[in-house]
Amino acid sequence: MAPSIVFILLSTLLRVTSGYVLPNEEGFISGVISDKGLDYAKDLLIEKGIASIVLLQLPEIENSAQVPFVGNAKVVLSNITIKDIQVNSSSLRTGENGFVLVVSGATANLSMRWRYSLSSWLIPIGISDSGTASVKVKGMQVGLTVNLRNQEGTLNLTLLDYGCYVGDLSIKLDGGASWLYQLLVDAFEGNIASAVEEAISEKIREGITKLDNLLHSLPKQISLDKTAALNVSFVGNPVLSNSSIAIAINGLLTARNEALVPQSYQKGLKISSACGGLPKMIKISIHENVFKSASLVYYNAGKMQLIIDELPDQNILNTAEWRFIVPQLYKRYPNDDMQLNISVSSPPFIQVTYQDVGATIFVDITIDVLEDGEVIPVACISMEISASFAVEIIGNNIAGRLRLQKFSTYLKWSKIGKLHMRLIQSLMSSVLKTVILPYLNFKLMRGLPLPIIDGFSFQNANILYIHPWIAVCSDVSFLGDYYLSQQSPYLS
């Protein structure tokens, strides 16, 4: 078989089971595959497993048998090829010991070539012949049990038990005599059955070994850009129930190339499996601390600042436009160009509520006058911005858009005397709505990658707000075999 599909799904689509305690208190992104998701994974696994077996050629079989009144016949079966497999029933069960996949009542069709040579004292001249035959395999059962455990942030996959059993087979000759058919049935039935069983069992071993190697190659950290990296190391062991599989990753952002040291955040203990009554394959939950860690990393790196020297209304960036609002500014710097140096003064405060994501952002806007090539700071206005963040799923990323709720301004310092803040507030409102929020939304719409493997995509995703978690309830669709060639399935 080719079991990689299901177990890649199990190891990368994360956690959400009702009342589950997180596998480890440091897991801030978590999720589960529901029974619907497991059925999808099982069917996809079987489909891909069959594809890997069809056209598989089995080893040549040679045997001899005594034909009554004729003599000894040497028969060789070659080009034994599995043409197709049909599955009648299957099941994927989870339990404390791991995953159990069972396929029962399967049938398979084989093609082969035969040749024989016959000699005896009655027939001094040897007789030989050749032809083709088809084989129908019935009552085939395939099963495997695997265990998935966490070791230092990496998942280890262990094959505990596996096997294939062939119940019955029938052979149809193209050419040959009736005695040869009976000879094939009597002498070769066990050989053909064993060859099928061993070939499928070997495919299972190969698949588990390749998948285990793939799991070991998964990165523990993914660089998002030149500033930040996402900690995707697994925490705790997978939690298996009779209808779902739960796994968690650390999920926090760190400065790029920074050692993966847990940050001090208050831990969430439980999350709900509810998807608002929607039967979805997976549910991925993201703790608000993921967003807080992103806020802290980009703030500490000095990335939350912007210099504005162009505006839709360019007149705002000239002291002449301010002559009635701040006369002393125009008096001291008549008709000089200006720029606005905008910087976030502290890491934005982010909190998931039961309706949306709330954000409080403290911004300092320093007014600079450009005179004779010199940048002259003349005043600083602080703004407290309250906004809501509407989460969206764009491709396989979680992104969103800020919506302004309210804002307030006050004068932080001034070199040009007292300012009339009521008059200035309208100008700041224009800057906020035309520059600051569009700029932030441009950055936010890039989003953060959700842990799903290449080749799969979210389908009909719904967003739920369950303080302090954001939950993505979604089905998934399989787009192709791109993932097979990737060493780093998280990357898109």
Placement of each model-derived feature along the sequence:
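Extended, solvent-exposed, non-transmembrane regions
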Residues: 141-143, 281
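Mobile, glycine-rich extracellular loop/lid and propeptide segments
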Residues: 126-128
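Short beta-strand micro-motifs enriched in acidic
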Residues: 145-151, 390-394
